[in-house]
Amino acid sequence: KLAAMIRCDTTSYANVYDPERFERFHAQLEQLFPLVHEKLERTVIDGNLLFCWKGKAHDRPIVLMSHQDVVPAEGTWSHAPFSGDIADGKVWGRGASDTKASLMAFFQAVEELLAAGYEPANDVYLSSSCTEEWAGDGAPKLVAELKRRGVRPFLVCDEGGGIITEPIGGIPGNFAMVGVFEKGKADVKFTARSNGGHASAPMANSPIARLSAFVTDVEKHDPFRRKFLPEVSAMFARLAPYAPFGLRLVMGNLWLFQPLMKLVLPRVSAQAGAMLHTTIAFTMQKGSDACNVIP
């Protein structure tokens, strides 16, 4: 089923809505999960999906979220990005992990529970945005619909961790990483200006030089303080028994080794280090439209 979902190209682009692309995907979902579509109340809002599974009570509803769109498939692939190939014990393709796998998982879970005649104790909502990859208005529209219905979720499960190998350098094995908190996000645009000019007579300290110096300085001197939140400390405590002796000693005694971990962890694992502080990543840049013009 996951392979079939991957074969439906649901690439999304900022501020561009292709209804036919997502209508094809919705038709595929209906074929794959007929009971979900027969028994649950379905609402479609500009390609965004909301299913309501009525439970015995309505005071503590849960929301299961997973977006249906994927980012453009660029670069080279060992398997075609929308092939849905099953090889080497894996399903390959764009969206296999981000995040049609979780979308498939909760649809399949509900499908099997419906087949078994199960009735949930409380209402369950299945929510899927088609604009997540570019921070579009899909999720806000679904939230607005829940508010309109007077739904106040007791629990929301969104895209988070997965079953990963070696979550931190030196700890082998497969671990199910359940996310219990989420970072915020801000996009900041930095602009350097000048009077412009021609590359044959460049001025000193050009906009590109200034921005390059700024980027280099920020990456060398991280302005954000590192700290261990309680949830992060608890994760290390849970992982400690599976670590080699030296690492187990450190992770099991964070009250003593926190200063050392703050220094070393980002060098050992970028992903683990990101749990300790606000991160900065420079991702897009634009200058002159011609190679011989100074912006």
Model regions and ranges:
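A generic structural motif
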Residues: 97, 194-200, 289
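Acidic/His- and Gly-rich active-site-bordering loop/insert found
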Residues: 1-99, 113-122
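Acidic/histidine-rich catalytic neighborhood of metal-dependent amide-processing enzymes
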Residues: 91, 97-177
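Short, intrinsically disordered, charge-balanced linker/junction segments flanking boundaries
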Residues: 1, 290-295
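Generic secondary-structure signature for well-ordered alpha-helical cores
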Residues: 7, 11, 34, 115-118, ...
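Predominant activation on well-ordered alpha-helical scaffold segments within soluble catalytic domains
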Residues: 3, 30, 104-107, 111, ...
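Acidic-enriched catalytic cores of C-N bond-cleaving enzymes acting on peptides and small amides
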Residues: 146-149, 154, 162-174, 178-187, ...
